[in-house]
Amino acid sequence: KKQLRNEMKALRAACGDRAARDERVCARFFSLPASEKRSFFIYNAFSNETATAQIAARLLREGKVVCFPRTEGNEMVAVRWQGQATVKGAFGIEEPVGEPFGGEIDVCVLPLLAADGQFYRIGYGGGFYDRFLSGKKIYKVGICYDFQIVGRVPREPHDVRLDALVTDARTMIRR
């Protein structure tokens, strides 16, 4: 897993046309039936991750509930974001200030370093999303650049499968 993570980080860092790719990912995301749902839990992109700002902004304009993650120790909570201040969290990622969201989350947009056609992903290795999603009925969408889709990612029994994968070049929906 470590080698694959490092490989993908290097490929992403070398990617020169991220803005155009991000726009295509955003357009493809909104072609998903799941984009019509009411409440969304979306990662706040940092470094050279696939950007989520356009997706979050459009969902807000459409009157949807948008939550960003905040880490609390070894766990992650959803905090509704309505444009309020953010502060740098434990991993240097901007996290929203405020109370955890008490409602149901319909769709989770997950970050990933690599994913495969069986809808498994590898993230950064902290297990935050696997723990957060465990036992919840939430539609899971992984977004990334197309070069991050590989033949097979290493997997473990606790790994949560995605319901859809959206890249700058294709949309894959698990049947």
Residue ranges and their predicted role:
Residues 74-175:
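Conserved phosphate- and dinucleotide-binding cores of soluble alpha/beta proteins
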Residues 1-103:
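N-terminal active-site beta-alpha-beta segment that forms phosphate/nucleotide-binding
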